[in-house]
Amino acid sequence: RKIMVNLTIDGRQISVEENTTIMEAARSVGIQIPSLCYLKGINEIGACRVCVVELEGKDRLITACNNICEEGMVIYTNSPKVRKDRRTTVELILSEHDCQCVTCMRSGNCSLQKIANDLDILELPFHQYLEHQPWDKTFPLIRDSAKCIKCMRCVQVCDKVQGLGVWDVEGTGYHTTVNVSGHNSIREADCALCGQCITHCPVGALRERSDTNEVWKAIEDPDKIVVAQVAPAVRAAWGEELGLAPEDATVGKIIDALKRMGINYVFDTTFSADLTIMEEGNEFVKRFTSGELKDRPMFTSCCPGWVRFIKSQFPHLVKYLSSAKSPQQMFGAVMKTYFAEKLGVSPEKIYTVSVMPCVAKKAEREMDLYYEEYAGHDIDAVITTRELIRMIRSAHISPQTLVDVESDRPMHEGTGAGVIFGATGGVMEAALRSAYYIIKGENPPAEAFTAVRSQGFNENDGVQEANFQINDITVRTAVVSGLGNTRGLIRKIESGEVHYDFVEVMACPGGCVGGGGQPIHDGEERAFERGKNLYYLDRNANLRFSHENPDVIQMYKEYFEAPMSHKAHMLLHTEHKKNM
């Protein structure tokens, strides 16, 4: 039986369950107490003190985010005393914050900017002091110390959710600040580039390196043929900031926008996701049936945040990664060989652009192991979903005027199996659909492997386990998202507590749909809802098995001969080195 607590907030008598915070109680009746540092279950430290309220009978104001409701409390969230204190607190925060909003990527989507406007703060009464720490601007993740408000969100998310501890507090008193742990440079840190610190920062102190100018230069270069790909997870989120409903924010409209910008050819990454499944699925069947996976499972390799993580934290397990490149890199390799030959041009003329939900993809593009086969990198530029939105706006494209345009040929088709790559469990499900076919010679029911789908991203420590029987073979699988959850799972594998044959890992909670390059909604976690959108698209797709993609089949006939062939190994696989 639930125990209820009765209290009064701003004259309203309410009843809430015990252990409810004052902030949660207020929100339950539509009273939005402002906050900057609060993240439910992650950062409840009352550091910013913007959420202070007045408790009748007490002189000192208390923070609403981490004080529990008690029987008979009388709370005032907007008394003169509260308003004066909150305003002074925000003015002090602004005195240590670079307020050049017009040059900040978060302008218009900044919690501090909104609170300052709501409090009618039009000038700063305090002398401004800004901290300037050096930063490597070539790194895919950028930190601007002058914008940091010391809310500690990045510290807590990296530590509690991702288990990496890249960020830490240094200094004391007035000189307290946040920096890379251990006085290291960011390149020396074990940063996986998941970007969760970016999406949980309430201001613009953390962002991705912008590569939009490089893309515009390529578009303007008459000697370049610009070819773009759009990742599955992007279609689930790009419309959020552009006023488009999920059902209207189609991949066809992204293709239209990119073509209007001047990009010559646009493809859907679901094609190369299907190609990845053909290679990775066949690789798994080969390694599994040969007995190679008796001691350790084969791990998926399409998430670069996870690949960076295993290289820095568990380098002895790198050999168990699938050798298949990610869909992004396979796409680039195919564009600069197969597609270049189709066009009759040299690979150097092709400029490949990836639109990704991910910051780590920017680093994956730059890794040495991806440009040994021919001149240049597989991928020339990576932009996040947020960068795509900025490019659409800067090109003066009205989202409401966009129409559905089909992707170009010959890499035109994509299957539902490729679409669900963007959600946790999607790669595993797609791989099992085709592995079943490889082993049995017939398709399984399309819904046969839904047990690997996450029911909610806070259950089972972020791990989904499932065993599947294919003929006389039992395949033991696990799916995990979030690097903190991943570390826990690997420790169990290492100790012998659990045994699997195939493990899918996604660095971001919920998978790519919750990626570090996706639109930011402060205080909201939208990965699960975005993931449901991708599963809907899969359910309604004409093709649901990667091995049935006619354009993939045709490419093997014309170019690669068969999955795992010598040519496929040269272009679609890689040797994972232990260094980042």
Segments (PLM) and residue ranges:
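Iron-sulfur-associated redox domains of electron-transfer enzymes in respiratory
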Residues: 18-78, 82, 209-580
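A short N-terminal beta-strand-loop micro-motif at the entrance of redox/enzyme domains
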Residues: 12-18
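Fe-S ferredoxin-like electron-transfer domains
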Residues: 49-193, 206-221, 225
